[in-house]
Amino acid sequence: MSMYMPGATAVGITFDGGVVFASEKRIAFGNFLVSKTTKKTFPITPKVGATCAGLVADMQILSLQIAALAKIRKMELKRDVPPNTVAKMMSNMMYERRYFPLLTQVIVGGVVDKPIMYTLDPLGSVLPDEYAAVGTGAEMALGVLDPQFKPNMTKDEAIDLAKRAVRAASLRDSASGDGVDVLVITKDGTEEFTEEIK
């Protein structure tokens, strides 16, 4: 972790009928703990959401701009904007800023036809996956996700796995911690809640 690139841990998991995002709540710059209550999960549309690691301010701006573009696109298409379209819009915006990049890693996903998820780096490359982890705690989170993820999990199994992955990273990564924010997206809409890390 560099002095000006804060650490974080964020994960995303697809399950049978939706996607779940989880992130911890800490922001630290170098040795300084800036915040213990930062939200790093973002609903973009009622059917698409995202989570991030890196500069949260950059992700806040990106999510607001993409949410506005998605509303315009929905009015043009007269139907829900699918996750791959949202991921591509994010990718385009991040690539346009490649010389002054948005310093954030993003997991974006949702469900319109079927659950799908993508990981984006600060330059906008789009990588599809069934589950993902980003940030300084990604290695620890993937140590939980890799052996325990299975396709077509139930909603409760996916939420539990996401929380355990973030918890494992928070216990070993000094830049992660102070609670878990969870965002669940299904065809019925979004659900958000916060839990302490125990």
Swiss-Prot record:
The formation of the proteasomal ATPase PAN-20S proteasome complex, via the docking of the C-termini of PAN into the intersubunit pockets in the alpha-rings, triggers opening of the gate for substrate entry. Interconversion between the open-gate and close-gate conformations leads to a dynamic regulation of the 20S proteasome proteolysis activity. GO terms for molecular function: endopeptidase activity; threonine-type endopeptidase activity. The keyword Nucleotide-binding does not apply. Its EC number is 3.4.25.1. It is an enzyme of class 3 (hydrolase). InterPro entries: Ntn_hydrolases_N (IPR029055), Pept_T1A_Psome_bsu_arc (IPR019983), Pept_T1A_subB (IPR000243), Proteasome_bsu_CS (IPR016050), Proteasome_sua/b (IPR001353), Proteasome_suB-type (IPR023333). It is found in: Cytoplasm. Residues 1-8 form a propeptide. Keywords: Autocatalytic cleavage, Cytoplasm, Hydrolase, Protease, Proteasome, Threonine protease, Zymogen. PROSITE patterns: PROTEASOME_BETA_1, PROTEASOME_BETA_2. It catalyses: Cleavage of peptide bonds with very broad specificity. The active site is at T9 (nucleophile). GO terms for biological process: proteasome-mediated ubiquitin-dependent protein catabolic process. One of its GO terms (cellular component) is cytosol. Component of the proteasome core, a large protease complex with broad specificity involved in protein degradation. PANTHER family: ATP-DEPENDENT PROTEASE SUBUNIT HSLV (PTHR32194:SF0), METALLOPROTEASE TLDD (PTHR32194). Belongs to the peptidase T1B family. The 20S proteasome core is composed of 14 alpha and 14 beta subunits that assemble into four stacked heptameric rings, resulting in a barrel-shaped structure. The two inner rings, each composed of seven catalytic beta subunits, are sandwiched by two outer rings, each composed of seven alpha subunits. The catalytic chamber with the active sites is on the inside of the barrel. Has a gated structure, the ends of the cylinder being occluded by the N-termini of the alpha-subunits. Is capped at one or both ends by the proteasome regulatory ATPase, PAN. This is Proteasome subunit beta 1. It comes from Nitrosopumilus maritimus (strain SCM1).
